[in-house]
């Protein structure tokens, strides 16, 4: 029995977490309609990440932390602005939570890192629900899916 020329055996090549996070965040940015602002916030998050990490050779940790900062800044600036919250309040909260999540990745002992975990979850849920309330139909569904998906990587980090 011959196999067709177009046949290719399935290869198990999972997506890298960073690429998956970036895809989800770009989708979220597109839904919010603030892609330039999100990319700008990503640059800020990357700068903060590199500043906080002592071992710059740990590329994976820096990459993951950059993605975390990306999510936090997108939530802080984009979703809070969409829901009508003061931008300065959202940015301050974002910076505080970003520092807490970076502490988790650096392995700092509690209570510094653990303190921010419930705040971070509540912050993201508040932003997602506020954004969903301001949308309708398919956009609300996509927003709900995207926000829920962006929370999944943190369940293993926080626990």
UniProtKB/Swiss-Prot annotation:
Position of sequence motif Cell attachment site: 106-108
Highest taxon listed in the record's lineage: Viruses
Per the record, what is one GO cellular component? Answer: membrane
What residue ranges are annotated as transmembrane?
20-40, 59-79
Q: Describe its membrane topology.
A: Multi-pass membrane protein
Please give the chief subcellular localization of this protein. host cell
> What are the cysteine partners in each disulfide bond?
none
Compartment(s) where it occurs, according to its Swiss-Prot or TrEMBL record: Host membrane
Which keywords does this Swiss-Prot/TrEMBL entry list? Host membrane, Membrane, Transmembrane, Transmembrane helix
Give the protein's recorded name: Putative transmembrane protein ORF159
Traced from the root, the source organism's taxonomic lineage reads: Viruses, Adnaviria, Zilligvirae, Taleaviricota, Tokiviricetes
């Amino acid at each position: 029995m011959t196999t067709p020329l177009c046949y290719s055996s399935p290869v198990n090549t999972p997506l890298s977490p960073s690429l998956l996070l970036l895809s989800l965040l770009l989708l979220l940015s597109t839904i919010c309609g603030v892609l330039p602002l999100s990319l700008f916030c990503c640059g800020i998050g990357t700068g903060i990440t590199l500043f906080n990490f002592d071992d710059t050779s740990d590329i994976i940790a820096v990459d993951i932390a950059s993605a975390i900062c990306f999510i936090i800044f997108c939530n802080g600036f984009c979703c809070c602005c969409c829901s009508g919250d003061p931008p300065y309040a959202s940015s301050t909260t974002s910076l505080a939570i970003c520092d807490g999540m970076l502490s988790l990745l650096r392995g700092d002992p509690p209570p510094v890192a653990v303190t921010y975990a419930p705040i971070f979850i509540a912050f993201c849920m508040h932003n997602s629900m506020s954004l969903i309330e301001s949308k309708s139909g398919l956009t609300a569904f996509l927003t709900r899916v995207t926000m829920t998906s962006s929370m999944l990587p943190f369940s293993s980090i926080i626990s």
